[in-house]
Amino acid sequence: MGCDVHDPSWQCQWGVPTIIVAWITCAALGIWCLAGSSADVSSGPGIAAVVGCSVFMIFLCAYLIRYREFFKDSVIDLLTCRWVRYCSCSCKCSCKCISGPCSRCCSACYKETMIYDMVQYGHRRRPGHGDDPDRVICEIVESPPVSAPTVFVPPPSEESHQPVIPPQPPTPTSEPKPKKGRAKDKPKGRPKNKPPCEPTVSSQPPSQPTAMPGGPPDASPPAMPQMPPGVAEAVQAAVQAAMAAALQQQQQHQTGT
């Protein structure tokens, strides 16, 4: 898209007259030098004509040799103030002027299009126009701030609405282990000659594992009541003490007879 600004030639208020006067003076001196070659060269006007013609020819040859394409542009854009320097803005407002036209040209684009950007000036190489160190290209290097869309961020309180699972108590898996250890310890203390009442006593330990539920801890309680762990241990200790007392009495009875 273009920008609705006037021709930037008006911004070089003194550039156009200076360039026109310089070219007309050089051309007049050149013509005077060629036309007055038969006159006395040692006179003041003759010396000025020779110097002016030499400067004009040097200027012309230098630009024809060094900046061929740029010289064509300078000749074409002579009367429109497009000379020596090149300025380009993002709104495609361009101008070629002498004495810092980029600041004026880009400022016109800047004010017209209301682009709140930063303008950077620097020497650049324009393809097809030779390596001209005097060409200054100014361009928009920072885009205007774009209003970001409002994104709804949920407050942290909503994230904490997730159900919190309370820690479950540990399952009583450690109870059968001491029972197994005690069952292993019983054969060690028992003598080889068992009394006739031992089968009735040994029938209690296998009945205890059947009372323990085999399901998870949150399952429904069984129909038969369970004995607390302390009561079961006390019963086992009493049974063992009774068995030991019976064995001692039997041994004393045997030794007495």
Curated annotation (Swiss-Prot):
Entry keyword set: Host Golgi apparatus, Host membrane, Membrane, Transmembrane, Transmembrane helix
Compositional bias per record (Pro residues), positions renumbered to this chain: 164-175, 214-228
Domain of life: Viruses
Topology with respect to the bilayer: Multi-pass membrane protein
Regions crossing the membrane: 14-34, 45-65
Spans annotated as Disordered: 149-232
Cellular location(s): Host Golgi apparatus membrane
Keyword Transmembrane appears in the UniProt entry: yes
This protein's record includes keyword Transmembrane helix: yes
Comp. bias (Basic residues): 179-193
Cellular compartments per GO CC: host cell Golgi membrane; membrane
Protein name, UniProt field: Protein UL133
